[in-house]
């Protein structure tokens, strides 16, 4: 499982780690978190998160990465089977589209600004915002079937290719402008 975001409270990374702890006994689940860690608040949050991972005994299941280059980020997306964005009050996350472009299905909250990219059961799933139980159930549902993950990943890639590439946006805008001229 891969997640991306700044190391800050609203990203709900403690909740995500707790979900991994709950699922670790049933699934060979591992989590990689890649985040920005450039100011003191983020560094403090990162330190608390690292301590939490250690106290939970999850050092072999959770990796915390900081300030990755684009090449390093792409390598992490390529390794992922599932992308989870546990954030609350997320206006719009480009990381979901990035994951989908790498054929990785996505899980995000139902109030996420980019939840509109997720078609339930087609390219990912939604969970109830800020609800650990809902997040755990949603991730567990995704983990139950490798075939389902693969198919949702394929669907995610197709959706990005067909709906969210710049050329398609441009063509849609031009079509609208041409309609206005008439």
Locate predicted features.
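Conserved acidic donor-binding segment of nucleotide-sugar-dependent glycosyltransferases
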Residues: 120-121, 125-132, 141-146
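Short alpha-helical donor nucleotide-sugar binding micro-motif in glycosyltransferases
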Residues: 67, 75-80
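Conserved donor-binding/catalytic core segment of Leloir-type glycosyltransferases
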Residues: 1-11, 17-20, 32
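A short, well-ordered alpha-helix in the C-terminal region of glycosyltransferases
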Residues: 134, 141, 148-163, 169-175
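Nucleotide-activated donor-binding/catalytic signature segment of Leloir-type glycosyltransferases, i.e.
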Residues: 46-68
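Aromatic "clamp/platform" in nucleotide-sugar-dependent glycosyltransferases that forms part
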Residues: 88
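Short hydrophobic beta-strand element within catalytic cores of glycosyltransferases
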Residues: 105-108, 118
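Glycosyltransferase donor-sugar binding loop
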Residues: 30-50
């Amino acid at each position: 499982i891969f997640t991306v975001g700044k190391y800050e409270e609203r990203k709900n990374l403690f909740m995500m780690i707790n979900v991994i702890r709950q699922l670790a006994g049933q699934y060979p689940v591992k989590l990689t978190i890649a985040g920005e860690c450039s100011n003191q608040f983020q560094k403090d949050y990162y330190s608390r998160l690292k301590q939490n991972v250690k106290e939970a005994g999850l050092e072999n299941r959770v990796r915390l990465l900081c300030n990755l280059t684009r090449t390093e980020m792409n390598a992490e997306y390529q390794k992922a089977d599932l992308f989870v964005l546990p954030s609350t009050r997320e206006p719009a996350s480009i990381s979901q589209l990035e994951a989908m472009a790498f054929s990785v299905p996505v899980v995000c909250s139902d109030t996420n600004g980019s939840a509109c990219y997720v078609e339930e059961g087609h390219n990912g799933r939604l969970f109830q915002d800020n609800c650990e139980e809902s997040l755990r159930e949603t991730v567990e549902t995704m983990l139950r079937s490798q075939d389902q993950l693969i198919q949702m990943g394929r669907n995610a890639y197709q959706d990005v290719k067909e709906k969210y590439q710049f050329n398609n946006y441009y063509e849609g805008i031009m079509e609208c402008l041409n309609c206005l001229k008439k």
